[in-house]
C-alpha cells in the first residue's frame, strides 16, 4: 500500500507494535478519511494503560501490526457526513469503547459488552490505517 495520502487521508507518525515483546517502532502511517459516523483526531497526548501493556507484551493476542493507546486527547481534524456533535477544531478526549447505547448491555450500564452491529467494522473492510 502506498504511504501517499490521497488528499482526504492524513500522513502521521505513530508508535507501531510489530511484534509482542519488542520495542514499538516509530513509523509514518496513512490514516484514512473518516467514515460517515467517524471522527479523525489530531492526537496531542495519549496514555498507555495496563491493557495496552498486555497487548505489547503479548499477553492479549491481537492482530499485528497495531497502534496501542486508546486514552487520547486532541483536536478534531475531520468528521464523517453523519457526525453532528463535534466539528473540526473542537478539543476532544476519546472513548474507544464503542457502544450503541440501546442494546440490553448498554441500557444496563455494561457498555463494554455491547454487540450492537453499528459499532463493528464490516468483515473485509479496507484498513483505516496503513503503513
Write out the residue ranges for each language-model feature.
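Extracellular beta-rich ligand/substrate-recognition surface
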Residues: 16-23
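Active-site/binding-pocket entry motifs
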Residues: 23, 47-49, 98, 120
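NAD(P)H dinucleotide-binding glycine-rich loop of Rossmann-like/cofactor-binding domains
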Residues: 100-131
Amino acid at each position: 500500500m502506498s504511504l501517499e495520502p490521497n488528499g482526504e487521508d492524513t500522513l502521521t507518525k505513530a508508535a507501531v507494535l510489530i511484534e509482542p515483546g519488542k520495542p514499538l517502532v516509530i513509523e509514518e502511517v496513512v490514516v484514512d478519511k473518516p467514515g460517515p459516523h467517524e471522527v479523525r483526531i489530531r492526537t496531542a497526548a495519549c496514555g498507555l494503560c495496563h491493557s495496552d501493556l498486555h497487548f505489547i507484551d503479548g499477553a492479549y493476542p491481537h492482530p499485528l501490526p497495531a497502534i496501542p493507546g486508546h486514552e487520547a486527547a486532541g483536536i478534531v481534524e475531520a468528521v464523517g457526513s453523519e457526525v453532528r456533535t463535534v466539528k473540526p477544531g473542537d478539543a476532544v478526549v476519546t472513548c474507544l469503547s464503542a457502544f450503541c447505547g440501546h442494546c440490553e448491555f448498554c441500557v444496563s450500564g455494561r457498555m463494554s459488552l455491547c454487540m450492537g452491529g453499528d459499532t463493528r467494522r464490516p468483515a473485509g473492510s479496507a484498513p483505516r490505517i496503513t503503513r
